[in-house]
Amino acid sequence: MHIKTLTVSQLNRYVKNTLDADFILNNASVKGEISNLKIHSSGHIYFSLKDGGSKINCVMFKSYAYNLKFAPENGMDVVALGNVSVYEKEGSYQLYVKDMKREGIGDLYVAFEKLKEKLKEEGLFDDVHKKEIPKFSKKVGVITSPTGAALKDIINVTKRRNKGIELLIYPALVQGTDASRTLIEGIKILNKVEDVDIIILARGGGSIEELWAFNNEELAYAVYNSKKPIITGVGHETDFTIVDFVSDRRAPTPSAAAEIAVFDREVLINEILNYKYNIKNYMENIIKEKRNYLNLYKQKIEANSPTNIIVNEYKNIDNLKELLNMKIEGKLNKEKNNLSRLSSLLEAHNPLNVLKKGYTLIEDEGNNLITEKEALKELNKINIIFKDGRAKLSIEYIEEF
């Protein structure tokens, strides 16, 4: 019989092909305990599954790990679904996990979803039933474990935000078979305390089994029927319980629940001071505006008063009088200038001025001016006019040139 010699790579490839062709190994469902867990920065998860007798290496790639409903931890019992194949480089086989569920949790998830759907159909989750969260609570009821971290967180937040707020704490179990009963009792008792303004139902984080008391149907009805508003702060931000859907406000953590229930005193003081400042400015602006209107109306009244009208008329008369005087003075000056001009013109044409140069004027006895010698032929006597007098002369002869 001839035996074919294979290289290591050929052998690993052959084993891989053989495993990949196996129907059972391609659809394997393996139950075991997680160990050697490593969550890589790439998002891939590497771990081993073990039981009392052996273990198998496993890998869950990022695309599948993204859809996990829980955070895997060492020591956790799970059921992994995937295919068995060979990692050729190392010559080792491992389970390539595509999905993973916590062992024994499946029934709890089914019960959770069933109750959630039932209460939703009954309208317990409807916003119309949500009670208003008071903005300024004076006393806050807290239902939680007296020894848990949740209570410490709530107390710390309350002291930081408002030391004047009173916390009324009802010590309750927050996990175990009797937890739901004590939580319901706490709601009933705090509803009877008249000055409790709001109730916080809280506990710290935990597994689904540890939080299961908050998925109780009777507790859900107790929260729904509470006369006082209830804020739930159960687990961490990713944890959701039935009471979170029923409550009037769901907070991601107990600390966040306290932030909602307890108003910040410093913030309130600052808001009041800000309102005071705004009101002061508003009133000052109104007063300023009204004062301006008052001054305007005052000016109008003063302007239209009889005294001011008379004073203004006197001013108008004085102005008209001054204007009239200016007009008259201007007219007189103009006439004086015209008179002076005409006087100068008349003076320039005064015949007596010619006489001052040694000339004389000749008139007949009727004082008619004689300008030609022919007129003398009919006259015996003439008047001679000098610059400073006149003389009467007789004509002896007339000589022609």
UniProtKB/Swiss-Prot annotation:
- Tell me which GO cellular component terms the UniProt record holds: cytoplasm; exodeoxyribonuclease VII complex
User: What subcellular locations does the record give?
Assistant: Cytoplasm
The UniProt catalytic activity note for this protein reads: Exonucleolytic cleavage in either 5'- to 3'- or 3'- to 5'-direction to yield nucleoside 5'-phosphates
Which example biological process does GO assign this protein? DNA catabolic process
Record bears the keyword Hydrolase: yes
Subunit comment for this entry?
Heterooligomer composed of large and small subunits.
> Any idea what this protein is called?
Exodeoxyribonuclease 7 large subunit
Q: Which gene encodes it?
A: xseA
